[in-house]
Amino acid sequence: SKEKFFTQGQAEQMAWKNGKLVTDKAVRVHPAFRPMGAVFSNMNGKDSSRALAFVDEFNRLQIAVDGEDIWRSGTAVGGGSMTLEQETGQVTSRVMRTAFYKIEPTPLAIDLDGDGVDEVVVPQNIVKEGLIAIVFKGPAGFRLQSIDTGFEGTITALGGFKTDDATQPTIIATVVRYKNILKTAAETQVIMTVPQE
């Protein structure tokens, strides 16, 4: 229902059955999980449970496994440029109450170094336009490294793929450059990296 769509800490696994998308079962997620800015990855290890990486309400990247928090960034990440207004269905003083949600960019889980374990790439628009964070698991645990891409605008989406003949993945980013302070006019660039051997 529309009242429960953005409720924190809940998720349902959906399945395609008889030509329709239906609820299969409830999924255990972290209590702070929001359905915006989230990705599953194998960054906790190839043979362990998949980790859920998501941007929490305080703009920190959290990594959870089976609903348990295993890491939280100290640096702010995310910073979407869109805000969604939702009617809550509650009326107070004859006024319909609404809630506002910041739409966060979805992190990208992709193996950057060819070791078979995903790294998580997430924009840091909230810190600086064109800045991205790469989270990886090393011998001492999880680590976040910020990289300035040089993009002049807000990174709104990330994607990537790896071909059989390349050791490095191809990364695709959409960057929006707003033309005024009200963000009513903009131009979008789609930028793609090429693997270097």
Name what the model sees in each region.
Residues S1-E197:
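Beta-propeller-forming repeat regions
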